[in-house]
C-alpha cells in the first residue's frame, strides 16, 4: 500500500502553502482521503507562479519572484506596471552595449540612471542635460592627472638644481682661467688698500673691525669703497706695482720726517712696523675729522677713470708730494 500524500506532506516547501485546516477536511483526516484532498489545493497556488511576469520579462518560477525585495523601487515599478529599463541599453556617448542599470535618480521612476562600463560614464534618462554623459565621474583619470603634476614638479626641481650646479662650475672655470685656480694666487693679485695709504693716516685700520689679513693682503670693509677696491685687477704687473708702492712709501716717509711736523707724526719712532702700519699719536687730529676729509676727497674722484688717483699715485709710481689736500680741520 503506497501513501502518495505523505511525500507532499513531508516536503518543506508545501508546509506554508497548505493551511492546517485543509488536512482535516470533513473530519476524516489526511490518511483517509489521501492525495485527493491535497492535490486540488496545491495546483491553484502553483498556477500564479507559472503565469508570465506583468512587466514582460517572463516568469521563471518561484525564484524570480523571491529576488525582488518588498518595498523597493523595482517593486513599486512592478506595482505601477512600469517597464524596467533595458539591461543592455546603448551608451549615448560611445554606442556601447556594455551598460548596466544603477538606480532611479531622485527616487523618480521616470529618471533611470545607467552606467557604461566601456567609457566609465554615468547618464540619466529624462533628466535635464543628462541624456549624454559629459566628462567627470572617473576616479582613475584624476589619479593620472595628480601623478603627472608630481612629475612636472620633480622635473622643474631637477632643472633648477642642474642650472645652479652649472653656474657654479662656470664661475670656477672663469676663476681658474684668469687667476690660476688657487685661492692664494687670487688673493696675491688683489692689492691691499693699507699699503697705498699715507703713513699719516694709518690709524684708519682701527676703524675696520672686520678685517681679514692673509699674507699681508686685506680687504677693508669701507662699504662702497670696498667694492671699488675689489674691482681693481692688477694682472701680471702686480709685483712691479708693489715695488713702486714700497718705494713711494719710503720716499714719503723721509719727506715728512724732514718737514719736522711734530703735530702730524712722532719723529722718535722712525722705523715702521713689519706689517705696514705706523704709530699715530697726534692729539690734534681726530678720527672723525680724517674720515670726513677722506670722504670728501673720494666723492669727487671716479675710480673708473684712474683707479690709483684716489691716493694721488700716478702711473709712473711717483711719490706723493702734495700734502695740502688733507689739511687738519680744527
From Swiss-Prot:
Record's function text: Transcription factor that binds specifically to a 5'-AA[AG]G-3' consensus core sequence. Probably involved in early processes for vascular development. The PEAR proteins (e.g. DOF2.4, DOF5.1, DOF3.2, DOF1.1, DOF5.6 and DOF5.3) activate gene expression that promotes radial growth of protophloem sieve elements. Triggers the transcription of HD-ZIP III genes, especially in the central domain of vascular tissue.
Changes seen on gene knockout: The pear1 pear2 tmo6 triple mutant variably displays reduced radial growth. The pear1 pear2 dof6 tmo6 quadruple mutant plants showed a greater uniform reduction in radial growth, associated with compromised symplastic trafficking.
Gene Ontology MF, one: zinc ion binding
Protein keywords: DNA-binding, Metal-binding, Nucleus, Transcription, Transcription regulation, Zinc, Zinc-finger
Name of the molecule in the record: Dof zinc finger protein DOF2.4
GO biological process terms held by the UniProt record: plasmodesmata-mediated intercellular transport; regulation of DNA-templated transcription; root radial pattern formation
Inducing or repressing factors: By cytokinin in procambium. Antagonized by the HD-ZIP III proteins and by mobile miR165 and miR166 microRNAs.
Zinc finger map (Dof-type): 89-143
PROSITE patterns cross-referenced by the UniProt entry: ZF_DOF_1, ZF_DOF_2
Coiled coil location: none
Biased composition (Low complexity): 40-55, 146-165
Keyword field contains Zinc: yes
Annotated InterPro entries: Dof (IPR045174), Znf_Dof (IPR003851)
Regions of compositional bias (Gly residues) in chain numbering: 56-68
Tissue specificity of this protein: Specific to the vascular tissues. The PEAR proteins (e.g. DOF2.4, DOF5.1, DOF3.2, DOF1.1, DOF5.6 and DOF5.3) form a short-range concentration gradient that peaks at protophloem sieve elements (PSE).
Location relative to the cell: Nucleus; Symplast
Pfam family, one: Zn_ribbon_Dof
Organism expressing this protein natively: Arabidopsis thaliana
Binding residues annotated for Zn(2+), in chain numbering: 91, 94, 116, 119
Main location: nucleus
Superkingdom of origin: Eukaryota
One cellular component (GO) term of this entry: nucleus
Biased composition (Polar residues): 14-25, 265-276
UniProt-annotated stretches for the region Disordered: 14-70, 133-165, 255-276
UniProt keyword annotation of Transcription present: yes
Amino acid at each position: 500500500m503506497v501513501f502518495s500524500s505523505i511525500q507532499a506532506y513531508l516536503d518543506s516547501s508545501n508546509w506554508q502553502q497548505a493551511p492546517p485546516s485543509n488536512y482535516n477536511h470533513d473530519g476524516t483526516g489526511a490518511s483517509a482521503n489521501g492525495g485527493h484532498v491535497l492535490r486540488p489545493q496545491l495546483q491553484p497556488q502553483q498556477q500564479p507562479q507559472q503565469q508570465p511576469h506583468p512587466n514582460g520579462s517572463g516568469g521563471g518560477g518561484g525564484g524570480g519572484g523571491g529576488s525582488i525585495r518588498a518595498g523597493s523601487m523595482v517593486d513599486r515599478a512592478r506595482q505601477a506596471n512600469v517597464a524596467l529599463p533595458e539591461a543592455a541599453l546603448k551608451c549615448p556617448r560611445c554606442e556601447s552595449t556594455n551598460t548596466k542599470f544603477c538606480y532611479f535618480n531622485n527616487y523618480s521612476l521616470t529618471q533611470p540612471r545607467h552606467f557604461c562600463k566601456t567609457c566609465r560614464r554615468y547618464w540619466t534618462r529624462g533628466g535635464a542635460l543628462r541624456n549624454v554623459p559629459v566628462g567627470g565621474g572617473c576616479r582613475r583619470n584624476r589619479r593620472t592627472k595628480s601623478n603627472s603634476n608630481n612629475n612636472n614638479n620633480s622635473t622643474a626641481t631637477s632643472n633648477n638644481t642642474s642650472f645652479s650646479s652649472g653656474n657654479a662650475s662656470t664661475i670656477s672655470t672663469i676663476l681658474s682661467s684668469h687667476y690660476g685656480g688657487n685661492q692664494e694666487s687670487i688673493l696675491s693679485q688683489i692689492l691691499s688698500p693699507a699699503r697705498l695709504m699715507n703713513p699719516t693716516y694709518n690709524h684708519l685700520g682701527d676703524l675696520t673691525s672686520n678685517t681679514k689679513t692673509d699674507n699681508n693682503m686685506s680687504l677693508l670693509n669701507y662699504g662702497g669703497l670696498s667694492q671699488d677696491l675689489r674691482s681693481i685687477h692688477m694682472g701680471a704687473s702686480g709685483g712691479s706695482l708693489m715695488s713702486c708702492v714700497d718705494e713711494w712709501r719710503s720716499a714719503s716717509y723721509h719727506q715728512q720726517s724732514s718737514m719736522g711736523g711734530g703735530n702730524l707724526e712722532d719723529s722718535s719712532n722712525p722705523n715702521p712696523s713689519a706689517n705696514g702700519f705706523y704709530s699715530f699719536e697726534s692729539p690734534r687730529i681726530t678720527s672723525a675729522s680724517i674720515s670726513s676729509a677722506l670722504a670728501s676727497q673720494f666723492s669727487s674722484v671716479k675710480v673708473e677713470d684712474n683707479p690709483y688717483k684716489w691716493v694721488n699715485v700716478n702711473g709712473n709710481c711717483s711719490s706723493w708730494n702734495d700734502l695740502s689736500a688733507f689739511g687738519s680741520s680744527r
